[in-house]
Curated annotation (Swiss-Prot):
Family annotation (SUPFAM superfamilies): Type II 3-dehydroquinate dehydratase
Keywords: Amino-acid biosynthesis, Aromatic amino acid biosynthesis, Lyase
Role summary: Catalyzes a trans-dehydration via an enolate intermediate.
Cross-referenced Pfam families: DHquinase_II (PF01220)
UniProt-listed Gene3D superfamilies: Dehydroquinase, class II (3.40.50.9100)
Site (Transition state stabilizer): 19
Catalyzed reaction equations: 3-dehydroquinate = 3-dehydroshikimate + H2O
UniProt subunit comment: Homododecamer.
NCBIfam families cross-referenced by the UniProt entry: aroQ, PRK05395.1-1, PRK05395.1-2, PRK05395.1-3, PRK05395.1-4
Gene designation per UniProt: aroQ
UniProt similarity note: Belongs to the type-II 3-dehydroquinase family.
Protein name in UniProt: 3-dehydroquinate dehydratase
Residues the record lists as binding substrate: 73, 79, 86, 100-101, 110
Length: 146
């Protein structure tokens, strides 16, 4: 496998399947990652995954990765984390921002993102399928000739 994508999931996403299923769906994070691993394997791309409720662990994973692309669901850090934004900008790895719910149809504080203006694209409101869309787009970009 010549390409690698880092999948970053932020706080509380470890509770998927149990936390507000009417908003976030019934799939667990493990289910979602398993499906993405199959999609990546078919495309002969390596998918590395981290989920953490600790901002510094996500930052350290971004600093340490040798991936050529990042897919990130910053979760609640979307609206608060300049540090995570700076980590992404510091490594200069292109990234897609994903959200399970349509953040623009929710509370006003969820409308602001510290990431959207720097992301290749933002996918929200499609549930777990949003990750599949982001992975397909990332794979397509990685396979485009320079």
């Amino acid at each position: 496998m010549s390409h690698k994508i880092l999948l970053v999931n932020g706080p509380n996403l470890n509770l998927l399947g149990r936390r507000e299923p009417s908003v976030y769906g019934h799939q667990t994070l493990a289910d979602i990652v398993a499906e993405l691993n199959q999609q990546a394997k078919l495309a002969e791309v390596e998918l590395e995954h981290i989920q953490s409720n600790a901002e510094f662990e996500l930052i350290n994973a971004i600093h340490a990765t040798d991936a050529q692309m990042i897919i990130i669901n910053p979760a609640a850090f979307t609206h608060t984390s300049v540090a995570l934004r700076d980590a992404l900008l510091g490594v200069a790895i292109p990234f897609f921002e994903v959200h399970l719910s349509n953040v623009h149809a929710r509370e006003a504080f969820r409308h602001h993102s510290y990431f959207s203006d720097k992301a290749i694209g933002v996918i929200c409101g499609f549930g777990s399928q949003g990750y599949e869309f982001a992975l397909a787009a990332a794979i397509k970009r990685l396979n485009q000739p320079l």
